[in-house]
Design a protein with these regions (language model features):
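Short, structured surface patches at the beginning of a domain
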Residues: 1-123
């Protein structure tokens, strides 16, 4: 299954830009998104208190999760690292549109995931 996750922080923001970017990204790679998960919630809220938490329980080995950028997963470093770790442990591939990275269950992915989540926190 290929999942796309979209998060905006306020009602004043729209999901359309992220949806467009993810659709374009998927089309370039000849992917078909099976499930879209969208929510309007602060990235500082715990993943378990968001639709993302349900999605993380649902995904399984071989699935792919696409986000527009790593900061859509969360704003706190430890939260993002926990989400990335959960994906890696399940052998789920995480693709980021903005950064153009493929994060899997390998050491290079773990290093990149740490660096990106740190930069998202600094922003």
């Amino acid at each position: 299954m290929i999942y796309a996750y979209i998060r905006v922080s306020t009602d004043k923001q729209t999901v359309e830009n992220q949806r467009f970017e993810i659709n374009r990204f998927a089309k370039q790679r000849d992917f078909q998104i099976d499930v879209w998960v969208e929510e309007t919630v602060s990235g500082t809220r715990s993943a378990k208190d968001r639709k993302l938490g349900v999605l993380l329980k649902r995904i399984k080995k071989g699935d792919t999760l696409i986000v527009s950028e790593i900061s859509r997963l969360g704003r706190r470093l430890m939260e993002v690292m926990s989400i990335l770790n959960a994906c890696m442990l399940k052998n789920v591939i995480l693709l980021t549109v903005k950064e153009k990275y493929e994060l899997g269950n390998n050491i290079q992915s773990q290093i990149l995931a740490f660096a990106f989540s740190l930069s998202a926190q600094i922003e």
